Amino acid sequence: MVIGPFINASAVLLGGVLGALLSQRLPERIRVSMTSIFGLASLGIGILLVVKCANLPAMVLATLLGALIGEICLLEKGVNTAVAKAQNLFRHSRKKPAHESFIQNYVAIIVLFCASGTGIFGAMNEGMTGDPSILIAKSFLDFFTAMIFACSLGIAVSVISIPLLIIQLTLAWAAALILPLTTPSMMADFSAVGGLLLLATGLRICGIKMFPVVNMLPALLLAMPLSAAWTAWFA
């Protein structure tokens, strides 16, 4: 039985609850500065993943086509609508952030928690090897990340633990079918595309550039097939 997804989801859940409880006691300067630090950390992780790229054209094409599909399907608009409805469930919060700021930050952390290369690879790795160490290490970071964001976004951060658990359990259980079909170069290109998404997420959290990160998610589905095709036809 896999345990990593449950540990990771619990870390987000507890971090979100603790952050919401401490929101009135944690100084604003710490919350603001730490949010920027987490954005910077996301940028750093993204860079480390991007440099692993094995086939640059495949990575670029997957990102471009994935973003195009996301734009056509209006993925981020759909998420924004769902998040706006979720926000209405927490109107009793004493310190409710502005609607636009809430939407932007909430969408960013959904991607940060649920679509990070570390989480996806960690879940797949545990599904194949039974080793939960990657997800356990990620849980420490996610606990403090959730706590900091919950100070400004409230208990809604804890809700992210539900899709996080579902995604990671699905990946872990499907890993036995997926990983035998992959090659090291496919995994490298998949990680590189995830790194680009983390770079976009980091820039978004820092407020530098509001990339439509959710619209870029289909790129993750295209990364491995395009990498395999590029290797077969051009490498």
From Swiss-Prot:
InterPro entries: DUF554 (IPR007563). The keyword Transcription regulation does not apply. Keywords: Cell membrane, Membrane, Transmembrane, Transmembrane helix. GO terms for cellular component: plasma membrane. The chain crosses the membrane at residues 2-22, 34-54, 56-76, 102-122, 147-167, 178-198, 210-230. It is found in: Cell membrane. Its main location: membrane. It is a multi-pass membrane protein. It holds the Pfam family DUF554. PANTHER family: INNER MEMBRANE PROTEIN (PTHR36111:SF2), INNER MEMBRANE PROTEIN-RELATED (PTHR36111). This is Uncharacterized protein YqgA. It comes from Escherichia coli (strain K12).
